[in-house]
């Protein structure tokens, strides 16, 4: 075959391949169009919730993002509730979404999270918490991890470690808060919450080591709310790098602890790391190294903002309601009066902080996160006369019950006593600051105890405090709401 014939043959072969490629593209395009038409036809035959999906891909994302930026998300939801009712559809960040409001919506989500919904976190979050963290996994895996962490975060573990937690908080207030005329509550609360996690989860008590890990955490957290672009200079890349650095640090601690446990140099209950390394499920299987690392990291990240923000918001609300603060002072000083010098708070003492717990509940009612995705439908969901198609995202709005006068009298008013008068009569699924069902926040009792102990030692140490700006605004919804400037205050120590 001469060169000309070879060229012609190759040309014919190329033409045939090109024709095949074009044909394949056309056929694929037709198949996609048919699938889209069938889906469209199917959706048109379903009774979807009312609402608007907005522009293709964009949906109502611009309005939603503006509401986030301007702290008007409640108005974004309220406008649609008034127009469409407690169930409406929208499209957010390229995802068709159904928003459920009210107690019935809360019930559907919280009682069916594993039967009807996929995991509640995005791939972006999973890359930071790890694929085996309690916030990502479901089914038996979730049950096993939940049982493992409950041994430390629940009442049994708290009764063992409450004295240690109390001492950490007392020392932190004496060393970092006391002696200063002015402090930023949110900033120091974050420092305190991280120090407690570092000590009680990993037995890290060296101040410099805590400081370096705290700095690393501050590079990780923005990644949870950033665009997931893994490219130099972007927040998500910095978060991934920070997470990798932290995991290496934790891995070294884990290997040393495993050796110490094997030769009796460490206790099986001394901290969360030991508890997880020593845990075996009902079949005698231990947790993997990945499961231990993922869940310690996830619990540190999850508790950091939520707990510190509540400390700041609680003090801010009490500064606006001195009559409530005086009741807290009386309760805490009464408990302190029965303690000997140097004697720490006990589990029994915490259970006696009834009014302070009411204040905390009222703070959570008024300033819980407003809005959040709860997962994607893994099957068609029939609810309130509508069909929520498989693959659509479901979101809820906690404030739709927390701020609803159907469930709470005068919901705009700060009235901690409502949880004394109404606590036993609250309608189910109306007060849900920690979620509910099988995926209720696993650390809610740990956080509750931490905040109550903080209030106790704050009241014991300071006779009064005054906000620098009494009219400081609230920022951060739908994330944990916080005072816009961190709530700077002037402190007056007790003599």
Curated annotation (Swiss-Prot):
Molecular function GO terms recorded: heme binding; iron ion binding; oxidoreductase activity, acting on paired donors, with incorporation or reduction of molecular oxygen, reduced flavin or flavoprotein as one donor, and incorporation of one atom of oxygen
GO biological process assignments: paclitaxel biosynthetic process; sterol metabolic process
Localization, UniProt: Microsome membrane
Pfam families: p450 (PF00067)
Entry's EC annotation: 1.14.14.-
Reactions catalysed according to its record: taxusin + reduced [NADPH--hemoprotein reductase] + O2 = 2alpha-hydroxytaxusin + oxidized [NADPH--hemoprotein reductase] + H2O + H(+); 7beta-hydroxytaxusin + reduced [NADPH--hemoprotein reductase] + O2 = 2alpha,7beta-dihydroxytaxusin + oxidized [NADPH--hemoprotein reductase] + H2O + H(+)
Binding site for heme: 441
Keywords recorded for this protein, A-Z: Endoplasmic reticulum, Heme, Iron, Membrane, Metal-binding, Microsome, Monooxygenase, Oxidoreductase, Taxol biosynthesis, Transmembrane, Transmembrane helix
Membrane topology: Single-pass membrane protein
Residue ranges of the TM segments: 17-37
GO cellular component: endoplasmic reticulum; membrane
Stored Gene3D superfamilies: Cytochrome P450
Keyword Endoplasmic reticulum: yes
InterPro entries linked to this entry: Cyt_P450, Cyt_P450_CS, Cyt_P450_E_grp-I, Cyt_P450_sf
Pathway participation: Alkaloid biosynthesis; taxol biosynthesis
Family: Belongs to the cytochrome P450 family.
Function field: Catalyzes the conversion of taxusin to 2-alpha-hydroxytaxusin in taxol biosynthesis. Catalyzes the conversion of 7-beta-hydroxytaxusin to 2-alpha-7-beta-hydroxytaxusin in taxol biosynthesis.
Protein known as: Taxoid 2-alpha-hydroxylase
Organism of this sequence: Taxus canadensis (Canadian yew)
